[in-house]
Amino acid sequence: MPRKIEEIKDFLLTARRKDAKSVKIKKNKDNVKFKVRCSRYLYTLVITDKEKAEKLKQSLPPGLAVKELK
């Protein structure tokens, strides 16, 4: 079941949760989507700024499996 997250801080808190399994990063020409899989929901954050997306990618938790998609 999908859920949308609007704020970067909320996304980082969700990514640090114990039930967060993996993060998928989808890059389009317009935006970058970060999708974190938790036990119940798939949380999605959409970022239109490429520099913010790179910063967020660097600040993801180290134990989380990160997969980049086109």
UniProtKB/Swiss-Prot annotation:
Q: Which compartment or compartments is the protein found in?
A: Cytoplasm
UniProt GO cellular component terms:
cytoplasm; cytosol; cytosolic large ribosomal subunit; cytosolic ribosome; eukaryotic 80S initiation complex; focal adhesion; postsynaptic density
A Pfam cross-reference name: Ribosomal_L38e
Which biological process annotations from GO are given for this protein?
90S preribosome assembly; axial mesoderm development; cytoplasmic translation; middle ear morphogenesis; ossification; protein-RNA complex assembly; regulation of translation; sensory perception of sound
Which InterPro entries did the record assign?
Ribosomal_eL38, Ribosomal_eL38_sf
Point out residues bearing the modification N6-acetyllysine.
9, 67
Gene Ontology MF term list: RNA binding; structural constituent of ribosome
- Where is it predominantly found? cytoplasm
Q: What does the UniProt keyword field contain?
A: Acetylation, Cytoplasm, Isopeptide bond, Ribonucleoprotein, Ribosomal protein, Ubl conjugation
Q: Which domain of life is it from?
A: Eukaryota
Give the position(s) of the covalent cross-link described as Glycyl lysine isopeptide (Lys-Gly) (interchain with G-Cter in SUMO2): 4, 9
Q: What does this protein do?
A: Component of the large ribosomal subunit. The ribosome is a large ribonucleoprotein complex responsible for the synthesis of proteins in the cell.
Q: Spell out the subunit comment.
A: Component of the large ribosomal subunit.
The similarity annotation says:
Belongs to the eukaryotic ribosomal protein eL38 family.
This protein's name: Large ribosomal subunit protein eL38
User: What is the originating organism of this protein?
Assistant: Homo sapiens (Human)
Per UniProt, what is the name of the gene that codes for the protein in this document? RPL38
